[in-house]
Amino acid sequence: MKLLVVGSGGREHAIAKKLLESKDVEKVFVAPGNDGMTLDGLELVNISISEHSKLIEFAKANDIAWSFIGPDDALAAGIVDEFNAAGLKAFGPTRLAAELEWSKDFAKEIMVKYDVPTAAYGTFSDFEEAKAYIEEKGSPIVVKADGLALGKGVVVAETVEQAVEATHEMLLDNKFGDSGARVVVEEFLEGEEFSLFAFVNGDKFYIMPTAQDHKRAYDGDKGPNTGGMGAYAPVPHLPESVVDTAVDTIVKPVLEGMIQEGRPYLGVLYAGLILTADGPKVIEFNARFGDPETQIILPRLTSDFTQNITDILDGKEPSITWTDKGVTLGVVVASNGYPLDYEKGVELPAKTEGDIITYYAGAKFSENSRALLSNGGRVYMLVTTADTVKEAQDTIYSELNKQNTEGLFYRTDIGSKAIR
């Protein structure tokens, strides 16, 4: 069996590496991938995620059994619809089902209609109306670009002035282009955030271990929002009852609602949740695996990932099993300057062996192919599984202390919220 993973980051490295572990899989291609993936025996295909017709041609020519779609923008552009129209199987939602992610306003409408707990909100395309709403509600308050913005279109404003400025940047200064042509302004929710993922086909879903991501660039949750600087799973201090409540009040009604809307969901659904005094509420939905959460969830999967996805695609009941060992924790190493302007071309340390997995995101071979160089904002991620968060931290950080990370940076407090 040959498979295709579409995307190029650490998330796709983790997906492809896990698929390749299956005894039934002969080859896993990644389009376009990154050079670091080849160290794990993955084959790169030089086709960008936006070239749907070329990807379809490749899948047909290479007898690909099915494709796994990683990135949000490919899903929003209807890549799954095009694969299906060409008679090809793809694991991911259609464009209409993925609107849960590519329009925050649509997601809010679905939540209100199907009684899913979330923050109170208003949606605006007119700056003066948005400004009046912000001034009426006061701060703290959250301003979000309606469309996709690489995880950077959310501003948690501590003052009214800051919220108005963020709204001005989105609506009038076109900071995010069409993605910011509308803004969702919502109440600030107090509580602890966590991520809940599920494999989904229609009204059937299979919950994964909970995870906690670290979005801010620097220690102590300081600095600008990023795509994510590290994560761990499961969240040890989160009661099972909270997960059960989230499944009953959030996952089930949303998936049933999507069927009623004529947009049945297939793929991975990510619910970004916050545990408030009133129980779990939705901050956002993503229509795919998170990055970096994928890299710490998939190592915990003990069943055959390829068989699991094949069964879900075929409408069969998958046999999905997870390890109950301790915790899996990962730390992202990024280029200096990320998430703003960052440098490239920094030589990377050798790939780790043994208990520490290296997943590559922005990595490229030098011209003489002897060294891997940085070629993106987030460059690589080190992941390990241990009995406790503290042990996992010690393993990762002692390895990072040995590595030459000049020109790169990482947070030194990933997982610390779990140590109480």
Predicted feature residues:
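Internal nucleotide-binding/catalytic subdomain
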Residues: 157-292
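Solvent-exposed alpha-helices and their adjacent loops that cap or buttress functional pockets
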Residues: 21, 38, 91, 113-115, ...
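Active-site nucleotide/adenylate-binding loops and adjacent lid/helix of ATP-dependent enzymes
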Residues: 5, 102-182, 241-252
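Short, charged, surface-exposed secondary-structure boundary motifs
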Residues: 38-41, 56-57, 99-105, 218-219, ...
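Active-site "cap" helix and flanking loop/linker of ATP-utilizing ligase/carboxylase catalytic domains
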Residues: 247-269, 286-347, 351-355
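Peripheral (often C-terminal) accessory segments that flank ATP-dependent C-N-forming ligase machineries
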Residues: 310-420
